[in-house]
């Protein structure tokens, strides 16, 4: 059984990690442990680079907290221009896999709040009256009327980030390129 450390305490992100690992390695093949670690970036990362750095930093911090684990996973949501998205970083002792989620265009009034220094989750809580929105379906769930959620979008991106760990065609071609 794989010991997977989720570098987050957010239930929506933990569920996405659990689903992606189950889909990849099988039901009951992974034990997910949540740890609270710093991202090393701002509370609301702006731009692709800062957001990806946050996901990678979460993995580095989780590795220090639980060095005995088989996998470490960082998920960091960010804003670039008028879009929200997230980076997924998955590592084991030998390999890193990464993927960026789908993006969602945000309304101008929310972007104004973000430009004023507020987090997307806070802005969504204000307009919905739900203080837990970022720990549930997120902006994605609200704006797609529940057709998608943070969990479902992150689940897809995590499946892509896990490709280097299980797909023999990918592994053979990746190893050949490194030689």
Curated annotation (Swiss-Prot):
One Gene Ontology molecular-function label: ITPase activity
Pfam entry (one): NTPase_I-T
Residues spanning the signal sequence: none
One Gene Ontology term from the biological process aspect of the record: nucleotide metabolic process
Cofactor note: Binds 1 divalent metal cation per subunit; can use either Mg(2+) or Mn(2+).
Keywords in alphabetical order: Hydrolase, Magnesium, Manganese, Metal-binding, Nucleotide metabolism, Nucleotide-binding
Keyword Secreted (UniProt): no
Cofactors demanded by this protein: Mg(2+); Mn(2+)
SUPFAM superfamilies: ITPase-like
Residues annotated as binding substrate: 8-13, 68-69
Binding site for Mg(2+): 68
EC numbers, comma separated: 3.6.1.73
Catalytic activity as recorded in UniProt: XTP + H2O = XDP + phosphate + H(+); ITP + H2O = IDP + phosphate + H(+)
Purpose of the protein: Phosphatase that hydrolyzes non-canonical purine nucleotides such as XTP and ITP to their respective diphosphate derivatives. Probably excludes non-canonical purines from DNA/RNA precursor pool, thus preventing their incorporation into DNA/RNA and avoiding chromosomal lesions.
Family note: Belongs to the YjjX NTPase family.
Subunit composition and interactions: Homodimer.
Name used for this protein in its record: Inosine/xanthosine triphosphatase
